[in-house]
Design a protein with these regions (language model features):
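Mid-length scaffold segments of soluble, non-membrane domains
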Residues: 71-118
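Serine/threonine-rich, low-complexity intrinsically disordered segments
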Residues: 8-10, 176
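Active-site-adjacent structural segments surrounding the nucleophilic cysteine of cysteine proteases
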Residues: 2-8, 15-80, 124, 141, ...
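Extracytoplasmic/secreted proteins, especially bacterial periplasmic and envelope-associated proteins
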Residues: 40, 44-48, 69, 82, ...
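A mature extracytoplasmic/lumenal domain signature
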Residues: 45, 102-105, 124-126, 137-139, ...
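Noncatalytic regulatory segments and standalone regulatory/sensor domains
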Residues: 22, 79, 113, 117, ...
Length: 184
């Protein structure tokens, strides 16, 4: 193989987790998609983030990153889902450092640029429960947020203003989880 091709392949492998669109104002992470079970958006979001980090480190599949298992372990009847504090604890018990914070647009951009997907809580309506999604990308030129929405599909394009409204209604709750070994 010619040296130029080898350099190109090595470069592509080095950035495979963070993909930049042709437009420098947009970026997205190739976060695996997991479809949720009933009331299972939290479990599916945890599974997506854990599977993403497994891919980044070339680790084999881990049963602790399966949404059905996470749902069985963490489901709370009173919450009709999973409590945010239990999501954080699950990550910590499985070798992750976690940070929960009231996020801003700049936080999403900074973490995505570093190859770190985020879990965000959204409140789609006044009577609907919280809904957890994985923020996997941004398209600033088109003012879109790219979500892995476990109730819908991978890379769902949501208008930034709608995302901000639903995120604000949920207190802008944001969870960052990174493997302890990576310290990314």
């Amino acid at each position: 193989m010619p040296p130029r091709v080898i350099r190109t392949v090595v470069l592509m492998l080095g950035v495979c987790g963070v993909l930049f669109a042709a437009n420098p104002a947009g970026l997205w992470l190739d976060v695996p998609f997991v479809k949720q079970q009933k009331d299972g958006c939290g479990a599916a979001s945890i599974a997506m983030v854990m599977q993403y980090w497994q891919q980044q480190h070339g680790a084999p599949a881990n049963p602790k990153a399966e949404a059905a298992r996470i749902q069985r372990v963490l489901y709370a009847e009173a919450a009709h889902g999973i409590y945010a504090s239990d999501m954080e604890r699950y990550f910590q018990q499985n070798g992750y450092v976690t940070f929960t914070f009231s996020g801003e647009w700049v936080d999403l951009k900074q973490h995505l640029e570093k190859g770190r997907p985020l879990i965000a809580a959204l409140k789609p309506g006044s009577v609907q429960p919280l809904h957890y999604v994985v923020v996997a990308g941004l398209d600033q030129e088109r003012q879109l947020v790219l979500l892995n929405d476990p109730a819908q599909r991978k890379l769902l394009k949501q208008d930034q203003s709608r995302f901000e409204q639903e995120w604000k209604a949920a207190g802008r709750w944001t969870l960052l989880a990174v493997p302890k070994a990576s310290s990314r």
